[in-house]
Regions:
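Conserved AMP-binding/adenylate-forming
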Residues: 1-72, 79-82, 101
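Glycine-centered tight turns that cap/initiate beta-strands
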Residues: 5, 109-112, 162, 168
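Short, solvent-exposed loop/turn elements at beta->coil junctions and helix N-caps
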Residues: 51, 116-120, 168
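Short glycine/proline-enriched turns and hinge-like loops at secondary-structure junctions
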Residues: 19-23, 77, 124-126, 176
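AMP-binding/adenylate-forming catalytic core of the ANL superfamily
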Residues: 31, 36-37, 64-157, 181
Length: 191
């Protein structure tokens, strides 16, 4: 963060311990001019402003991130958008929809990507990627290419169970992908 006297660290959301380089956790920051709290809402204030072992008050942003050895912060999504899933080895893994989107958008055929997470028949969370691709591409061929790309660039547990091609990505009034509409579309087409 390019501001003087602003400190940033990544902590484990479960125990508050500082993460090592390149480990994903909650982004927290401390500065001499942080807010004192939410107006008439001490409960929410206590959820976001916490005193750490250094006796400083830190803002817990609710964002997931990691810091590399050069000090660069990478944003990974929101804490509320973390799901648990099982890999083929039966181990439990964290599933980050934004990680999937960030990788799939690198594919040259992909114009936009929105990822939702749904339970499958075994009640395990799986990713469903909605993808808008360049006009004129053959659907099954491009779907296969995107899946192949996902297998090459994502951990096994994060590979979308299904790639759904979409002609127009739905957006909210604040110009963000409308994940509720994607969930509704998925439910409607998979009854």
């Amino acid at each position: 963060i390019p501001l003087p006297k602003v400190n940033v660290k990544i902590v484990n959301p479960k125990d508050g311990q500082e993460q090592k380089y390149d480990e994903v956790g909650e982004v927290c920051f401390h500065a001499p001019n942080i807010m004192s709290g939410y107006f008439k809402n001490p409960k929410e204030t206590d959820n976001i402003i916490k005193t750490h072992a250094d006796n400083k008050k830190w803002i817990h942003t609710g964002d997931l991130g990691s810091v590399d050895q050069e000090g660069f912060l990478t944003f990974h999504g929101r804490i509320k958008k973390i799901y648990l899933t099982k890999g083929s080895d039966n181990n439990v893994y964290k599933l980050f929809p934004m990680q999937i989107e960030n990788e799939l958008i690198k594919n040259e055929e992909v114009l936009e990507c929105g990822t939702i997470v749904v339970p499958d028949q075994e009640k395990i969370h799986v990713a469903i990627a909605f993808v808008r691709v360049k006009v004129g591409l053959e659907k099954e061929t491009v779907r296969g290419k995107i899946l192949e790309f996902a297998r090459a660039h994502l951990p096994e547990h994060a590979i979308p169970k299904k790639i759904m091609l979409i002609e127009k990505m739905p957006y909210t009034q604040s110009n963000k992908i409308d994940y509720k509409k994607l969930e509704e579309k998925y439910q409607k087409e998979n009854r």
